[in-house]
Each structure stands twice: as structure tokens, then as C-alpha cells.
A protein has these predicted regions:
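WD40-repeat beta-propeller superdomains and closely related acidic/aromatic-rich repeat-like regions
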Residues: 1-126
Length: 126
């Protein structure tokens, strides 16, 4: 069992290698490393930039980039290390609650949808 996240996890996402697990709850994202013997006894990475509950998490198909969306419409792209620690490499804003996020297969574009039915795409610098 893992513990240490600040609030009840509301969303979960593994990266494509299965070595990182991101959990979203409240405004903070917690990232656990499954390298070596797994996350028990390790200190997870904590990512903070949202001012509202995190509503969506999605890892890029390639590499260790994570996209997150929140109820206030904020979106962040995170660059992560293999231990789950990292930082924001870009942010954007939608007009309403982020309800979905998806990466293009080449990991260079993300699309996000919101509660008003709008869909927006962004190119992600590599």
C-alpha cells in the first residue's frame, strides 16, 4: 500500500513503460516510481501548479511527459525524471473544467476538451 499523497486520489495514469504512476487529487499531483523495488518506502514527486482540483492526467506515449488538467480550466505539461520528480515545462488555460486530455501518438501534440464541449490542441516543444 502507498501513502503520502495529500488528498484522495481522483485520477490515475501510468506512463507507457509502467515505471511511473501519477495520482491526482486536490491541486497536487503525486508521482510514484516503480523502478527497482517499487514505490514503498520511497518519497514520491509532488507537482504543484493548479489552483483547483486536478480533473485529468495523461502521459505522453513516448518519454516522461505528463499532461494535467484541472477544474478551473488550467492545463500543465510536466517533465519528469525516472524517480517521479520534475517540474512544469508549460501551462495553458481553457475557459472551463478540463474533462479530457489526449496525446497524439508522436507525443508532439496534446488535445484537451472542456465541460462546454470545446476542444483545443497545442504543439508541445520537444
Amino acid at each position: 500500500m502507498m501513502s503520502g499523497y495529500p488528498g484522495k486520489p481522483r485520477n490515475l495514469a501510468f506512463n507507457s513503460s509502467g515505471k511511473l504512476l501519477a495520482t491526482g487529487g486536490y491541486e497536487i499531483i503525486t508521482v510514484w516510481s516503480f523502478e527497482n523495488n517499487g514505490p514503498e518506502g520511497t518519497t514520491p514527486g509532488q507537482l504543484e501548479c493548479h489552483e483547483s482540483f486536478v480533473s485529468m492526467l495523461s502521459f505522453a506515449p513516448h518519454g516522461n511527459r505528463l499532461a494535467s488538467g484541472a477544474r478551473d480550466g488550467s492545463i500543465a505539461i510536466w517533465g519528469l525524471m525516472s524517480d517521479g520528480h520534475g517540474g512544469s515545462i508549460g501551462t495553458s488555460q481553457m475557459s472551463d473544467h478540463v474533462s479530457s486530455i489526449a496525446w497524439k501518438k508522436d507525443s508532439k501534440v496534446i488535445a484537451a476538451g472542456n465541460a462546454k464541449g470545446q476542444i483545443v490542441t497545442w504543439k508541445v516543444k520537444t
